[in-house]
């Protein structure tokens, strides 16, 4: 089951290169709703809210080779504060240098002062009365280096002259799984209420794996759950939770209650994203200028993330959306899934602008810098040049 990322904006011969050779090759700096870039290595100096009632603390976390959730676990442990008190505006990947705002209810500035976690820096601590919620950012600034290029002067000149103003608004590989792109497959099984297949797909089905991890997944596929548990390591906490819960209740649906609700929602969201990516592919030949019947956002045609409350476009775009629903044999009411959530469906722009795009070659390194609104993927931009998603 592919992830439906097939089309390109740039008409060019793409080049091979190494992305993310070092974490410093992929810098992600969060941009606040007010437009402030949380620059790496820079103190911003956010002012405390004047009439502060002691509710929330916000702070910037700069981290190298940490994803958001793992960094948060360490900060929770260091501050001896409950996980549920924390929030963040957006998630960041691991193999990168990233900045982002965290928020916490009832935390004191002093609790952050003596934190010593390798490759994590905390600064810009601010007292405020507002809770930091998911989506509470404008977007991100990316500075990306692609290494190990072997290009002629002519090729360098050709690529340097390219200008990229917008990109297809695909959901990137991160939504489906960098190593094992199966999140959307699990989501489809959950939508179909086939929890047994969802379980085996997530815990079994080895892809791009070796050693104990490969053997553990093979054991799951054979039904040898207890043996598999002994081989899954610390990086497979969710697989272990699922298996332990299944062994306790002998119920595949019940097994998924051992996972965080956000993760269970993410499975179905990934299936919606997979279908959305296909809409982009089918719309591509018609172009992305406004057509009769389009539903627009910022004067840009949108596609639907299919859910129980989906409102279809008219015209050609509506035909595309309905064709996918019919082919997948979808019953929209079934997107209300007990114990997993109500997936009402929304709309998303099919192309998205790129802001402040710059590129340069230096010492056989191609460096890109640009800004994207929240929810958009930098790897979709780099793919326009390299053809690769990771």
UniProtKB/Swiss-Prot annotation:
Which residues does the UniProt record annotate as the domain TRUD?
A: 166-353
- Known EC number(s)? 5.4.99.27
Keyword tRNA processing annotated: yes
Any idea which residues are catalytic in this one?
93
What are the UniProt keywords, alphabetically?
Isomerase, tRNA processing
One of the Pfam families matching this protein, by short name: TruD
NCBIfam families of this UniProt entry?
tRNA_TruD_broad (TIGR00094)
What's its job?
Answer: Could be responsible for synthesis of pseudouridine from uracil-13 in transfer RNAs.
Q: What is this protein called?
A: Probable tRNA pseudouridine synthase D 2
Q: Which organism is the protein's source?
A: Methanococcus maripaludis (strain DSM 14266 / JCM 13030 / NBRC 101832 / S2 / LL)
